[in-house]
Amino acid sequence: MDIITLAEVAGNLSVIGYGIGTLGPGIGLGILFGKAMESTARQPEMSGKIQTIMFIGLALVEVLALIGFVAALII
């Protein structure tokens, strides 16, 4: 195999790895928003606090996806 073919294979594998790596944050976001809606439906008076905590959790989960994206670009 020449160097160009190896570079293409490595690029394809990193994209596949990133695709698999985004499954966790995607599932995490779905659970996060679902539970936030459920909590707001149960206690509407706490919606402000629930929303604040939800946005903090959103940032933490999104960081995982961004780290996976950067790792895929580096490799």
UniProtKB/Swiss-Prot annotation:
Transmembrane segments: 13-33, 55-75
Membrane topology listed for this record: Multi-pass membrane protein
InterPro entries, alphabetized: ATP_synth_csu_bac/chlpt, ATP_synth_F0_csu, ATP_synth_F0_csu_DDCD_BS, ATP_synth_F0_csu_sf, ATPase_proteolipid_c-like_dom, F/V-ATP_Csub_sf
GO cellular component term, pick one: plasma membrane
Pfam (any one): ATP-synt_C
Site (Reversibly protonated during proton transport): 62
GO MF terms held by the record: lipid binding; proton-transporting ATP synthase activity, rotational mechanism
Identification of the protein by name: ATP synthase subunit c
Family statement: Belongs to the ATPase C chain family.
Superkingdom, natural source: Bacteria
Cited Gene3D superfamilies: F1F0 ATP synthase subunit C
Function according to Swiss-Prot or TrEMBL: F(1)F(0) ATP synthase produces ATP from ADP in the presence of a proton or sodium gradient. F-type ATPases consist of two structural domains, F(1) containing the extramembraneous catalytic core and F(0) containing the membrane proton channel, linked together by a central stalk and a peripheral stalk. During catalysis, ATP synthesis in the catalytic domain of F(1) is coupled via a rotary mechanism of the central stalk subunits to proton translocation.
Xref: HAMAP family: ATP_synth_c_bact
Entry's localization field: Cell membrane
Keywords: ATP synthesis, Cell membrane, CF(0), Hydrogen ion transport, Ion transport, Lipid-binding, Membrane, Transmembrane, Transmembrane helix, Transport
Assembly with partners or alone: F-type ATPases have 2 components, F(1) - the catalytic core - and F(0) - the membrane proton channel. F(1) has five subunits: alpha(3), beta(3), gamma(1), delta(1), epsilon(1). F(0) has three main subunits: a(1), b(2) and c(10-14). The alpha and beta chains form an alternating ring which encloses part of the gamma chain. F(1) is attached to F(0) by a central stalk formed by the gamma and epsilon chains, while a peripheral stalk is formed by the delta and b chains.
Endpoints of the signal sequence: none
